[in-house]
Amino acid sequence: NNLYPICSDFERDFPSVCFALATGVGKTRLMGAFVAYLHLAKGIKNFFVLAPNLTIYNKLIEDFSNPNHPKYVFKGIGEFAQNQPRMITGDNYLQTSQMTLFHSEVNINVFNISKINAETRSGVEPRIKRLSEYLGESYFNYLSNLDDLVLLMDESHHYRADRGMQ
């Protein structure tokens, strides 16, 4: 048993894992594999993928949502061929209602920290934290109250700055 120690305690109330991998080795594909595994093995259906800038944000949306894209992260995963995950982005989440969220087996939220930070610079509360008439609460609060939300951060070293912590 000493050859393969088992982790029994985390510094937080939730497990936190970090992968420091070189450019081009497939970090986005690894995120897709995490989503597939956590859904199929553990029944988790809510994921939040955070991008540090607009370029990576657009790339993540394409890689997670377009089965015809060469870098589609769920290629070969039969369970997602018939029931593709619902893609909720920083551009379309305001049109999302709780009813539509319950109809999807897997919800993948992709947001861009730069867009959220731009709103805080003007002294205004970010839209994600404002009341949504569709949900009856802010989308931020809705996400915060999900018991099974998994946060995936691409280029996570960008988020420790003061504005990212807000």
Positions of PLM-derived features:
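RecA-like P-loop NTPase motor core of helicase/translocase proteins
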Residues: 1-166
